[in-house]
């Protein structure tokens, strides 16, 4: 029997979406050959250090953990427009990612999603698309309405989120729009 704590990490694993755009993931999986349940988290953040602690925890306990960059930021291809490709439009990156993960040789076909904030919102957009292999979703928190102008969201989190988005935006028009929103918030 393989020790539970033995796992491997495959970096920058490509998956091709329905429109031909390639998104990249870091895949943490048990070292022992086999087919395992998969947990997917889709983010617009750098994958390395943010996901490692709990990705390793899940992989060492018999799960495959897929941390994927959304379309556009970091290694993933395509134009980055926040949340535009996560739901039920022409490009359904969330749906395609779930079905891609289910078809991999290390997957037993049971795929779940997890986490909050950006990842929580991508789950909210994924849910109505109903991928056949999506068995569970764990959203620990995500804003229902990103544009609210009340409370802590407006005071602290919203400007912080916008600054993070500017740093990660690769499309000039998206970056300019975010800058104008930050200027409005700070005035």
What are these regions (language model features)?
Residues 1-11, 37, 49, 69, ...:
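Beta-propeller folds
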Residues 66-67, 115, 139:
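Hydrophobic residues in well-ordered beta-strands that form the structural core
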């Amino acid at each position: 029997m393989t020790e539970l704590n033995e796992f491997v990490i495959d970096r920058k694993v490509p998956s091709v979406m329905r429109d031909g755009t390639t998104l990249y993931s870091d895949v943490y999986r048990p070292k022992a050959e086999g087919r395992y349940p998969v947990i997917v988290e889709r983010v617009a953040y750098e994958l390395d250090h943010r996901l490692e602690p709990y990705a390793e925890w899940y992989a060492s306990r018999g799960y495959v953990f897929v941390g994927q960059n959304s379309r556009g930021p970091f290694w993933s291809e395509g134009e980055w427009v926040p949340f535009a490709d996560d739901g039920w439009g022409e490009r359904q990156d969330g749906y395609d990612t779930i079905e891609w993960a289910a078809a991999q040789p290390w997957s037993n076909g049971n795929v779940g999603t997890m986490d909050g904030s950006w990842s929580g919102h991508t789950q909210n957009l994924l849910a109505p698309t109903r991928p056949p292999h999506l068995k569970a979703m764990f959203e620990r928190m995500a804003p229902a309405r990103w544009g609210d102008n009340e409370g802590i969201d407006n005071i602290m989190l919203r400007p912080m989120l916008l600054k993070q988005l500017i740093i990660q935006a690769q499309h000039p028009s998206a970056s300019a729009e975010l800058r104008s929103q930050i200027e409005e918030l700070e005035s």
